[in-house]
Amino acid sequence: MFRGKLRTAAVAAVTVVSLCLGGTVAAAADPIVDTGQALGSAVASNGSTLDHVTVVDPRHLTLHVFSASMQRVVPVYVQRPADTSVPRPTLYFLDGQVRREKTDVEEFLADQNVNVVSPSGGENAYWTDWKSPDPVMGVNKWKTFMTQELPPVVDAALGTNGVNALAGMSRVGTAALQLAIAAPGLFRGVAAYSGCALTSDPLGQLFIKITMDNYGYGNPANMYGEADDPAWAANDPYVHAAELRGTELFLSNGNGLPGRHETLDGPGIDGNVATLARQIYAGGPIEAVTNYCTHRFTDRLGELGIPATASFRNSGTHSWGYWQDDLHDSWPVLARALGV
């Protein structure tokens, strides 16, 4: 029985490198930061390529990647490894700027020898390929971007070692599992926090529809078609769970009840009573739904004999404080997948 609570008293993921010769030597300078130029260039099979690089500071840069499938340039935020002297693995952390602003992912992984790559723009489109252009969302081919267009560009530009893992929360947690299934072997590890990996289940479809309707996103019929369209099942991680065999997996969820972050000084609350109330009355029911989804998905993995680390909290809403906790708890699984 692999289901259980992951109780990590401390995450020993930060390594301080010092030489026994009596001093501390800083890592070699990053040539990308120094020159503003990528280490190499690559063109995906469909013509997608790196447009240009923006250096933000000594550890951070933005790759501007042209997507041939969507005919747009996508910003991809990057935190470089602590030591860039040799090729390093890559953690794809979805979605872009907002995840970096709402969690401590950059600080938490600052001392790790891993590229943290956060593409931006596909969250509201579920990071998937839509069947039809949408009046609101336009052309969405995010699965193509994440599995065929972006990886070769990232590997060449950053000089990676080709080892990847993927993490996402909420609807992006669903996408993380879908992407790993769509490209076997591309991502050696996946962490999905509070996702609903039941896209062809009526409750899962309703969850997607409500999310899009409430937040003004596109029409889900343009994504996978009407409710009985085979595309819903074709993109359902539950249906295709067997294809995750051999992938390091971390799944987490709260149960929707108020917990330790439902306080006025909780993450993202900033003393705002209305924000706290919304986190409880909206984030609670949403987390209860994803809890159902995650339990069913872990049950399915168990039936298939596929190992996974599952963390089910006895409280917690659909909110950033818990996802930051989940990131910390999932790091041993992701680190194992990345070989760091």
For each feature predicted by the language model, list its residue ranges.
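Non-catalytic cap/lid and distal C-terminal segments of serine-dependent acyl enzymes
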Residues: 2-12, 25-340
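Hydrophobic core
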Residues: 14-22
